[in-house]
């Protein structure tokens, strides 16, 4: 049996896909909301559920030809990816540089935009019935959002520590290093 296609009237299967897409979106959204990001739990839940709904329409409208349904599904997934890309683009902001010396503008919202995009993909995957892949993708998304942030903090602390040591080495008087020889 094909995993993607459900028998007509399988409301339990359809409900499971929608509910799981909602849960995945809510979990990712909660992660973003706790970090004070511009898009939160409701936004991510709606994106995941909307993507699942969009891909479920051609799946349910299979009709006589599964080839036609797969073709329609392919176009639907492309449309969802492009549409959500525009939604994410609205979250990306370009601001004035922190200092005039750097001259480079600050960009914010990229991670939120990318997270909305991946949440739409997860909703589409779950809507297609590939819920195991959706859960694995959710795990790796949360790992990226939470785990990589910790790694960045550790790297930043290490850099700061190295800068402090280098600064102290420059500010020590020249004979301070020789006093320890006694």
Curated annotation (Swiss-Prot):
InterPro entries: MgtC/SapB/SrpB/YhiD_fam (IPR003416), MgtC_SapB_SrpB_YhiD_N (IPR049177)
UniProtKB keywords: Cell membrane, Membrane, Plasmid, Stress response, Transmembrane, Transmembrane helix
Domain of life from the UniProt record: Bacteria
Membrane topology per record: Multi-pass membrane protein
Protein's cellular compartments: Cell membrane
Induction: By sulfur deprivation.
Pfam families named among the record's database cross-references: MgtC
Listed transmembrane segments: 11-31, 43-63, 73-93, 116-136
GO annotation, cellular component aspect: plasma membrane
Family label: Belongs to the MgtC/SapB family.
Descriptive protein name: Protein SrpB
């Amino acid at each position: 049996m094909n995993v993607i296609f459900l028998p007509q009237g399988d409301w339990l299967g359809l409900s499971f896909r929608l509910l799981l897409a909602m849960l995945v979106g809510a979990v990712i959204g909660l992660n973003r909301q706790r970090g004070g990001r511009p898009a939160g739990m409701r936004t991510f839940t709606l994106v995941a559920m909307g993507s699942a709904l969009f891909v479920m329409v051609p799946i349910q409208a299979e009709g006589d030809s599964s080839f036609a349904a797969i073709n329609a599904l392919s176009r639907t997934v492309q449309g969802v990816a492009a549409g959500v890309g525009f939604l994410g683009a609205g979250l990306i902001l370009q601001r004035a540089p922190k200092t005039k010396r750097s001259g480079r503008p600050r960009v914010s919202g990229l991670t939120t935009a990318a997270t909305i995009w991946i949440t739409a993909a997860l909703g589409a995957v779950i809507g297609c019935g590939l819920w195991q892949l959706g859960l694995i993708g959710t795990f790796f998304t949360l790992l990226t959002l939470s785990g990589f942030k910790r790694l960045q903090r550790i790297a930043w602390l290490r850099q700061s520590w190295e800068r402090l040591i280098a600064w102290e080495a420059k500010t020590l008087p020249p004979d301070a290093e020789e006093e320890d020889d006694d």
